[in-house]
């Protein structure tokens, strides 16, 4: 079974999936969403969950640097509750502080153009979040 990693934004949802052993995370795709209208791409997520045999979902939880919860962390909590209800799978909120910055640094180091970075940053951030979670399980 595999673990799904998600990085929630207001307009996009970064998606990553673990390998079958739960050792590595791979960025999969970015799904266009509309958080204000409550459209979270659940149809596509269901297809991914079924295709990869996902048994756990990890959602990035963007705490403030001092550990407090701001509006984005609260949005992630609401999203996690919707995921639990929709998919009946365990959902883990995982501290994602600096994950997008780490993903950005990796892409810059790989000499990825700014235009291409914009297209892949969300799925890369999801992979960073998921890899952090997977590493904690070993």
Swiss-Prot record:
The keyword Cytoplasm is annotated on this UniProt entry: yes
Molecular function as annotated in GO: nuclease activity
UniProt cross-references to InterPro entries, sorted A to Z: RNaseH-like_sf, YqgF, YqgF/RNaseH-like_dom, YqgF/RNaseH-like_dom_sf
Keyword terms of this UniProt record: Cytoplasm, Hydrolase, Nuclease, Ribosome biogenesis
SUPFAM superfamilies attached to this UniProt entry: Ribonuclease H-like (SSF53098)
Compartments where found: Cytoplasm
NCBIfam families (alphabetical): RNAse_H_YqgF
Family listed: Belongs to the YqgF nuclease family.
Function: Could be a nuclease involved in processing of the 5'-end of pre-16S rRNA.
Protein name stated in the entry: Putative pre-16S rRNA nuclease
Organism ancestry: Bacteria, Bacillati, Bacillota, Bacilli, Bacillales
């Amino acid at each position: 079974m595999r673990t799904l990693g998600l990085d929630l934004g207001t307009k996009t949802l970064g998606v990553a999936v673990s390998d079958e052993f739960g050792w590595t995370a791979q960025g999969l795709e970015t799904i266009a969403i509309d958080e204000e209208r409550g459209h979270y791409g659940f149809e596509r997520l269901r297809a991914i969950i079924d295709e990869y045999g996902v048994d756990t979902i990890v959602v990035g939880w963007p705490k403030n640097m001092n550990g407090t919860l701001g509006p984005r962390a609260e949005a992630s909590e609401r999203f996690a509750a919707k995921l639990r209800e929709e998919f009946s799978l365990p959902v883990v909120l995982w501290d994602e502080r600096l994950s997008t910055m780490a993903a950005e640094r990796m892409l810059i180091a790989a000499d990825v153009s700014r235009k291409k970075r914009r297209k892949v940053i969300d799925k890369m951030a999801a992979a960073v979040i998921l890899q952090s979670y997977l590493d904690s399980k070993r």
